[in-house]
Structures are given as C-alpha cells and as structure tokens.
C-alpha cells in the first residue's frame, strides 16, 4: 500500500516510494501498489501513484471502483506485462485462470456509473479542496487527548492514542463507543482511531465529524 490504510494511515516518508521505484527497476522487480483504499479519489487523485508521482508496474484496486455498492476488483498492469500474456500461439490459452464472476455485467455497469459520477460531480477535486480543512481540524485535536501521533493525507487521517495502563486498545474502544453513541463512525485498530470521510463530504459535515470526535476524546 502506498499509504498503509488498515494499519493506521501510515504515510510514507518523503522520497520513500521514489527510492523503492528505483530499487525495483534496478533489480528487475515488479512494483505492485495495493490501492484498494487509496484509489479513486481518497488522496484527491485517481490513484496514490499520481499523488506521489511514482509509476508502479501493477495496481490492485477495488472498493472505490464501484463506491462499494457492488463487489468488484481490478488489476491494472503495464503494457509489456499484458503483452507477455497475449503473445502465445493463437490456438493456446495464455492464462488458464479466471473467476466465476469475472467481468460481471452488473458490477461493470456499477463501475462505469461510479466513474461518471466522480467526474460529473468533481469529487476528486472536492477531496483536494477539503484536505487543508481536514488537516487543520485533525491536528487541532493534539491537545484534546493523550495522543502520541497524528497523521493525515488526502481525506484520510489517524490519531494514535497513548495506551491505557490497564490494557492496549481500551482507550480506542472507549472513543469508538462514545463516537457511535453520538451518531459518528470511526475506525479503531489497536490504539489508533482512523477517519476516512466520503468524497461527497461538505465542510460543515467535516466540522460535525471532528466536533463529535472531540467530544468523544474528551471522555478519556
């Protein structure tokens, strides 16, 4: 993952992915980006690869390709990798592999409709426009609770809570429960609280999310 999502929104250091690309190219290793989370606007671009200006050899994507409405995944590959599968004898099957629901017409229709909505409603641009406000609000929480780190990029961010002496994850569970009771949903992994608002979010909705999270943190 160019930005590790489920692990806690781990943003790579400046130059890390570029150096990884150089090493993979030098040693003939395929660079594969898992963009199931970061793809389709989460970072304000089609893919994180564009945000970081790094061209991988393959991209795995899903979720945002249909906005999660219908299950669908895809793999984007470099042209010469594609050609390696297509240059076999005409009578041969280049890749004897497939899934029962590959190319499912309903999933494909949902994907095409989703891509149209992204473009027509300017949702990637909306994510870019909201990013500074998202960043300001999440870092404004630094004195609201015992935090050890705050990370963000695009419309995703995370707060690392100082572990409760009584046991790991207890503080995060408390924040999750209080946020839920107040009508908000946050992701909890260990002592990390993650936030990934939808691309259609408006500034006032972003404020409501952070106001609710601030109240949940106040209960620690």
Which positions does each model-derived feature cover?
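Conserved N-terminal phosphate-binding loop of PLP-dependent enzymes in the Aspartate aminotransferase
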Residues: 1-220
């Amino acid at each position: 993952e160019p930005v590790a999502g489920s692990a806690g929104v781990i943003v790579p250091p400046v130059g890390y992915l570029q150096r990884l690309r150089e090493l993979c190219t030098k040693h003939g290793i395929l660079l594969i980006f898992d963009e199931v989370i970061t793809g389709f606007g989460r970072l304000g671009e089609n893919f994180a690869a564009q945000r970081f200006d790094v061209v991988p050899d393959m991209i795995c994507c899903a979720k945002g390709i249909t906005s999660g409405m219908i299950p669908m995944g895809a793999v984007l590959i470099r042209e010469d990798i594609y050609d390696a599968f297509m240059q076999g004898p005409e009578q041969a099957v280049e890749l004897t592999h497939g899934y029962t629901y590959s190319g499912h017409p309903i999933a494909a229709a949902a994907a095409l409709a989703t891509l149209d909505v992204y473009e027509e409603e300017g949702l990637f641009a909306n994510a870019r426009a909201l990013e500074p406000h998202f960043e300001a609000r999440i870092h404004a929480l630094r004195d609201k609770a015992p935090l050890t780190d705050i990370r963000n990029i695009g419309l995703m961010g995370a707060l690392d809570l100082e572990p409760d002496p009584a046991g790991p994850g207890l503080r995060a569970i408390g924040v999750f429960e209080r946020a839920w009771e107040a009508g908000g949903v946050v992701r909890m992994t260990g002592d990390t609280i993650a936030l990934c608002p939808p691309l259609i979010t408006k500034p006032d909705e972003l404020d409501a999310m952070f106001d609710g999270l601030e109240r949940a943190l106040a209960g620690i």
